[in-house]
Amino acid sequence: MNFLFCSVGRRGELIKNFKKSLNEDSKIIATDCNNTAPALYFADKQYIVPKITDDNYLSTIIDICKKEEIKAITTFIDPEIEILAKNRKLFEGIGVEVLAPYAETASLCFDKFKMYEYLVDKGVKTVKTYGDFESFRIDYENEACTLPVFVKPRTGSGSVGARKIDNYEELKGICYNERDLIIQEFMDGNDLDVDVYI
């Protein structure tokens, strides 16, 4: 059984761990848009592909699946999860199982503010999050929230653009210069990331 791991980047240890769990007849094929992505070279075979935003990306991945007789596909980056999920039927049509949540779940998980609203609606205790500066400003002026805060892109991944802001004027400027940010109450403590593949 051959597996395709897309956008592998620096996650060589993850590929090594997957290889240990597979039988000797299984192969891991890896893709990335950057030929210097270290994790590529832990796989049994590598492909350099267009960026996920390229018009030819999906057809390139489909071609690899056919050529390498791929039975299951997944990705190591958040933005690509939704691409795989939305094209699940296309992959299933060539006998490839998409190892990703369904499109609705993928969309919800990728949009941090939608996820916040979902969690609040379900009664799950979560960090206070604002979808825009104006909402934050109202609470700030009413002393319902304080600085510092944590700002990050609403749909970002890999902590790109995420930062702590201590100053109100700096926050205001950032929010007016950069669109689609969320503002969260600052949570102090150890950061913990968990990736689960079942």
List PLM regions with ranges.
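Short loop/helix-cap segments at secondary-structure boundaries that form the rim of catalytic
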Residues: 37-43, 138-144, 173-177
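Short acidic-hydrophobic, aromatic-tinged amphipathic segments that line or gate anion-handling sites
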Residues: 46-52, 128-134, 163-166
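Glycine-/Pro-rich loop/turn segments that contact NAD(P) or position catalytic residues
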Residues: 104-129, 134, 138-144
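Short, charged, surface-exposed secondary-structure boundary motifs
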Residues: 39-41, 57-59, 107-111, 159-162
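Phosphate-binding site of ATP-dependent enzymes
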Residues: 163-198
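ATP-grasp fold ATP-binding core
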Residues: 119, 142-160, 179-189
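Glycine-rich phosphate-binding loop signature in dinucleotide/nucleotide-binding domains
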Residues: 64-70, 143-146, 177-178
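ATP-binding N-terminal substructure of ATP-dependent carboxylate-amine bond-forming enzymes
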Residues: 1-99
